């Protein structure tokens, strides 16, 4: 019975997602979960007293290690897995849908979700363009698209031909830097950046993900681009061919652009919509439900009308335009949100442009280009009563949230897979023990004799192995798109900054009423609440491992 109350409390903490802070320190020596200590009783969470002078410090440290190991094993119930719902909507800001009167949407990867089968087609077409039009070596044709290589949100240092993952504080995550298809050793990465992992602000990507020498790959279409870039670099390095990094980067990005400009991607999708377009019936259900509840809808996309029309007919039906109050195609986002000079032009049923001046935006009509300032003037849709959904954090959401006060929703298809991984027992146990071990390392570093340092080095090695295990569960090369080992990624930082809500697909809206209020959970700062497993039982003591931390005052 001694540990039953404590274990029950810890289980409740875990099942509640770790919300809430530590118990207030008590002057009583008893453990709140275990009752008064009896003769010889030992709460598994209560720290052993500091060893006496001359005691075997190594044995003391390993005893602490085993205590923590048992605690983690006992307090992590099976039901803690599968807590997160992949179909849920997650909130960065509090937002009530009852306040939203107008819903706006991007098209690609928002209204229309595409199958991963599209990526090999883009890769192969751009690879062949490089060979046939840019005269790159024929040997590059041996490379095929590898869907397991890259993840979204990576940065590419053009001058160094380095593809890497950067955290929210501009630090390269060591072990995630690749030149071509080969990992770059950590010490070489540090040397490349002047003895540090930090990327200075002036080199980093700017507001729209582009910097003077470093680009961030933010949209889903960039996955085949990163793969092709890495394959071409790999070929040149493997064959000892000299190349200019800037020219190579530009040629690859131009080849990828040609796939879009020439309409190849549009042709593939139009020829087999059943293969490439996913969840079309769910898109129809979302739009119909919103209209049935009196919401106004609009569409702003960079795609051409003929392509959008065929896709919407496939998903929604021939009368799809009657669902939308305004439809804008070839909008040229993100310039649409900042450039006041481009006027709207009306398209007729055949896709021909009209020359008359646009003084109002009519339901059922199609408009091309334009700009947000005229859009706001003509519709009077302003501020928090507008909620716009898109997949590109920069091109779709950044300006709308920061400059115009719209509410924004990010569509992140990768979220579904990542949540399923987080829900696995392997991930949960690995991460929890990793956090507990980190806490032990932090507290036990006060012991600096030779034997203790050897124990701590063993723990450090185990911690690094655990980090690599959890990273590889998501992607062997780069890990999760949302986290480095312990910090949010640069991608996550932008996701939180530019979106009120984020979800795996638009269909997640079907799980909530149209007047639902989303409440973000209070995220504790480092100084506010010690919530990890190694500190769960701080109610048992005034200060965790007080004897070991006596040097801190």
Swiss-Prot record:
Q: Name one GO cellular component term.
A: cytoplasm
- Which terms are listed as keywords in the entry? Cytoplasm, Hydrolase, Magnesium, Metal-binding
BP-aspect Gene Ontology terms? negative regulation of catecholamine metabolic process; negative regulation of dopamine biosynthetic process; negative regulation of oxidoreductase activity; negative regulation of peptidyl-serine phosphorylation
Where does it live in the cell? Cytoplasm
Among SUPFAM superfamilies, the record links this protein to: HAD-like
Question: Any idea of its EC number?
Answer: 3.1.3.-
Q: Which InterPro entries match?
A: HAD-like_sf, HAD-SF_hydro_IG_5-nucl, HAD_sf, Pur_nucleotidase
Q: Which Pfam families match?
A: 5_nucleotid
Q: Does the keyword Lipid biosynthesis apply?
A: no
Instruction: Extract one GO molecular function annotation from the record.
Output: 5'-nucleotidase activity
Region Disordered, annotated ranges: 26-51
Which catalytic residues are annotated? 106, 108
Highest taxon above the source species: Eukaryota
- What tissues express this gene product? Expressed in eye iridocorneal angle.
Is Ligase a UniProt keyword of this protein?
no
Tell me which residues bind Mg(2+).
Answer: 106, 108, 391
Task: Give the PANTHER family listed for this entry.
Answer: 5'-NUCLEOTIDASE DOMAIN-CONTAINING, 5'-NUCLEOTIDASE DOMAIN-CONTAINING PROTEIN 2
Name the job this protein performs: Promotes dephosphorylation of tyrosine 3-monooxygenase TH which decreases TH catalytic activity and leads to reduced synthesis of catecholamines including dopamine, noradrenaline and adrenaline. The exact mechanism of activity is unknown but may act as a phosphatase or promote the activity of phosphatases or may inhibit phosphorylation by acting as a barrier to interfere with protein kinase access.
Report quaternary structure and partners.
Answer: Interacts with tyrosine 3-monooxygenase TH; the interaction results in reduced phosphorylation and decreased catalytic activity of TH.
Its family remark reads: Belongs to the 5'(3')-deoxyribonucleotidase family.
Name the chain's protein: 5'-nucleotidase domain-containing protein 2
* Organism this protein belongs to: Rattus norvegicus (Rat)
Q: What is the lineage of its organism?
A: Eukaryota, Metazoa, Chordata, Craniata, Vertebrata
Q: Which gene encodes it?
A: Nt5dc2
């Amino acid at each position: 019975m001694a540990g039953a109350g404590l274990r029950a409390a810890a289980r409740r903490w875990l099942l509640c997602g770790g919300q809430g802070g530590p118990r207030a320190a008590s002057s009583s020596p008893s453990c709140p979960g275990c009752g008064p200590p009896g003769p010889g009783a030992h709460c598994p969470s209560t720290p052993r007293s500091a060893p006496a002078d001359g005691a075997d410090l190594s044995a003391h440290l390993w005893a602490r290690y085993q205590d923590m190991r048992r605690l983690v094993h006992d307090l992590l119930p099976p039901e803690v897995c599968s807590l997160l719902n992949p179909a849920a909507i997650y909130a960065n800001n509090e937002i009530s849908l009852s306040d939203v009167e107008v819903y706006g949407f991007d098209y690609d990867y928002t209204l229309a979700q595409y199958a991963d089968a599209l990526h090999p087609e883009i890769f192969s077409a751009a690879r062949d363009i490089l060979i046939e039009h840019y005269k790159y070596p024929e040997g590059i044709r041996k490379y095929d698209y590898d869907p397991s290589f890259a993840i979204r949100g990576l940065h590419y240092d053009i001058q160094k031909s380095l593809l890497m993952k950067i955290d929210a504080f501009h630090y390269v995550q060591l072990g995630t830097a690749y030149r071509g298809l080969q990992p770059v050793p950590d010490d070489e990465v540090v040397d490349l950046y002047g003895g540090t992992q930090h990327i200075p602000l002036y080199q980093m990507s700017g507001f729209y993900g582009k910097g003077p020498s470093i680009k961030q790959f933010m949209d889903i279409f960039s996955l085949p681009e990163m793969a092709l870039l890495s394959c071409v670099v790999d070929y040149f390095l493997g064959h000892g061919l000299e190349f200019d990094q800037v020219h190579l980067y530009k040629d690859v990005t131009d080849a990828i652009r040609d796939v879009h400009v020439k309409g190849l991607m549009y042709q593939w999708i139009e020829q087999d919509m059943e293969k490439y377009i996913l969840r079309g019936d769910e898109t129809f259900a979302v739009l119909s439900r919103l209209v049935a509840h009196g919401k106004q809808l609009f569409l702003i996309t960079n795609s051409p009308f003929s392509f959008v029309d065929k896709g919407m007919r496939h998903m929604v039906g021939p009368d799809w335009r009657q669902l939308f109050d305004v439809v804008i195609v070839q909008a040229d986002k993100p310039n649409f949100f900042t450039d006041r000079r481009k006027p709207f032009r009306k398209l007729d049923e055949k896709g021909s442009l009209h020359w008359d001046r646009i003084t109002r935006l009519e339901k059922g009509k199609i408009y091309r280009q334009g700009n947000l300032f005229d859009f706001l003037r003509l519709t009077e849709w302003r501020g928090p009563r507008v909620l716009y959904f898109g997949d590109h954090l920069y091109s779709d959401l950044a300006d709308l949230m920061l400059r115009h006060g719209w509410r924004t929703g990010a569509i992140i298809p990768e979220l579904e897979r990542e949540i399923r991984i987080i829900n696995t027992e392997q991930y949960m146990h690995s991460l929890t023990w990793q956090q507990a071990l980190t806490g032990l390392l932090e507290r036990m570093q006060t012991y600096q004799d030779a034997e203790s340092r050897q124990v701590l080095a063993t723990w450090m090695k185990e911690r690094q192995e655990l980090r690599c295990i959890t990273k590889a569960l998501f992607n062997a090369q780069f890990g999760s798109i949302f986290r480095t080992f312990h910090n949010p990624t640069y991608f996550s930082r932008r996701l939180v900054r530019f979106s009120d809500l984020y979800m795996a697909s638009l269909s997640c809206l079907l799980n909530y009423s149209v007047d639902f209020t989303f409440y973000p959970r209070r995220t504790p700062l480092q100084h506010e609440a010690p919530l990890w497993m190694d500190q769960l039982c701080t109610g048992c003591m005034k200060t965790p491992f007080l004897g070991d931390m006596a040097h801190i005052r």
